[in-house]
């Protein structure tokens, strides 16, 4: 059994990405894995990084990652890139 941290970045609960998230989580749980999921849009995550010290949200996500075995990112690709909210999350949470 693994603990999986899922980071989801799509604004619509009716999107193809929402279906991917739901199916992934249901299947992983059926296989005995533990899921911890954040929805960046519902959480209103601030993706702008200006070199400041991590805020409480960033520190919380980092702690949750430390307790996980795997990270899964679920987001659309728009113009060959992930949405800014996901890219900002990567910069703020995973950056040194």
State what each model feature region is.
Residues 1-96:
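N-terminal beta1-alpha1-beta2 submodule of the flavodoxin-like/Rossmannoid cofactor-binding fold
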């Amino acid at each position: 059994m693994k603990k999986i941290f899922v980071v989801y970045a799509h604004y619509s609960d009716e999107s193809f990405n929402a279906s991917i998230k739901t199916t992934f989580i249901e299947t992983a749980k059926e296989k005995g894995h533990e899921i911890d999921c954040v929805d960046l849009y519902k959480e209103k995550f601030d993706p702008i990084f200006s070199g400041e010290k991590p805020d409480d949200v960033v520190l919380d996500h980092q702690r949750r990652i430390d307790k996980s075995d795997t990270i899964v990112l679920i987001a659309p690709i728009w113009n060959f890139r992930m949405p800014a909210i996901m890219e900002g999350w990567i910069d703020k949470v995973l950056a040194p």
